[in-house]
Amino acid sequence: MTESEQAYDADVAVVGYGPTGVAAALTLAHQGVSVVVFERDRDIYPRARAVTINDWTMRIFQSLGIDERVTRVIEPQRALRWVTYDGTELMRVEHPPSTLGVKPRFYNIYQPVMEQELRDCAGEYGDLLRVEYGADVVELEQDDDGVSVTAVDEGTGERTQARVRYVIGADGGSSRTRGMIDCDLAGDTLDVQWIVIDCKVKRWWPDRDFLTFWSDRERPVVDIALSAGNHRWEIPLKPGETEDDFASPAQVWPLLAAMGVTEDDVEIHQWAFYRHHTRMADTWRDGRVFLAGDAAHLMPPWAGAGMQTGIRDAQNLGWKLARVLRGELDEAWLDTYEAERRPNAAFYTGLAVQLGRVIKQEASPEEIEAMNTVPEGLVTPFEPPLIAPPVLDGGWVRGPIGDASVVGRMVPQPTVGDTTGRMARLDDLLGDGFVLLGADVDPVTLLTEDEKAAWDALGARYVAVRPKASYTQGADDLVDLDEVLLPWLARYGARAVAVRPDRFVAAADIAGLAVPA
């Protein structure tokens, strides 16, 4: 170990150990990067906040080798519906089969339980991933070589310092990290206060497994089955109502009774109050310090994407940081983090606002009809934005992005076979690096000498995807057993695509397979 390496206590410090922080720590440790986490609280926040995850998030968990463990503590979600109190259904979103190698497409969660499972997985990395509980970060001092992190023990008041190369601030909506880098959080906070009521289920009732949005101007309600035998209602307080009006279970029960929920159905477990925020940080980076999750963006809950957006931030930043720290990528790669993640966070924020207008009956019938209208003439099969597979809007890609382009899309994940007859999900056979996939062609044959040298420098693999009715020809060939990959490439007229470690398509032969600038 060199003198320079000995000067660091860890490669990366993560401030905050909620879902975003633990996802960042897991992503880094999985890539062999040392992490120290500073978490102010000693215990997991006991109230459920996020209520759902989808197949994109589960694919991230798969990349970390923990998806099967997470699946054991979450439950499938049936569908989404928007209804009025007289029983009129305004809109429904069914969940079609996932293209990302996960079944089903959406899951209900109970956040404290899932969060504990994530922390248990992180705990298996030993000294590579060290967590300091009860440690409040009070100062960050960065220079050209790293960051000095000062934390205060909440119990003893003792100050400690750690020297790291980079810092990820994942310390939530009230982020101190954000303040330490003089970052503003622009946007709005709505005046309306909501009560969140978490209950233990005592018996099943009809259609409990729908995620139901009760649409009403005065009392719109989110009604959702959580995992582990829990159920939640989110209800706005009326003008003049305050927290003091709901200080006991006896005062809370009338809110549930109005929807026909009785003590035979559930037992009230806990309740809390909050307001909806629509805010985003003006920058997500200052030198060696990055923001992720709620520290960078806050959105209303209507799209179920707040926590998931943070987890996706963590993966995007984590795989890039790991490769920069290992010397495999230039530090300029870190500029792509915000360029790629900010548009996606803005998309889900806007979608949440739009869906909220339906729930609160602020959307006109014409607007609702437009939301339910399927556009014509698309190359990509239409799916409602809430459930459609993700697409990059920019960043480290080459070529046009849009309906008719494969660039920026997440490659589907069917079951494939290798030359030895092994069958597995695509990602499990591709590994975690850059890969060029050819449609029944060796992608190397489509590259110039300089292009191949550039991909070689990134450690890329070259894989031909063969039809299941043909022979494999090379040691790295894969067979499209589910007949998904080859038709997907053909839809966009692509003979070969370059796939990033996060499974987004960076380039295609149509616009050129050169490494994106």
Which positions does each model-derived feature cover?
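Core beta-strand elements of the Rossmann-like FAD/NAD(P) dinucleotide-binding domain
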Residues: 8-10, 156-166
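A conserved short coil-to-beta-strand element within the FAD-binding core of flavoproteins
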Residues: 133-147
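N-terminal Rossmann-fold NAD(P) dinucleotide-binding loop
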Residues: 21-22
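Glycine-rich FAD pyrophosphate-binding loop
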Residues: 29-49
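Helical substrate-recognition/capping region of FAD-dependent monooxygenase/halogenase enzymes
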Residues: 2-11, 15, 30-31, 84-87, ...
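Conserved FAD-binding catalytic core of PHBH/FMO-like flavoproteins
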Residues: 72, 119-120, 166, 170-276
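FAD/FMN-dependent oxidoreductases across multiple families
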Residues: 245-309, 329, 344, 348-351
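Active-site-adjacent segment of FAD-dependent monooxygenases/related oxidoreductases
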Residues: 49, 54-125
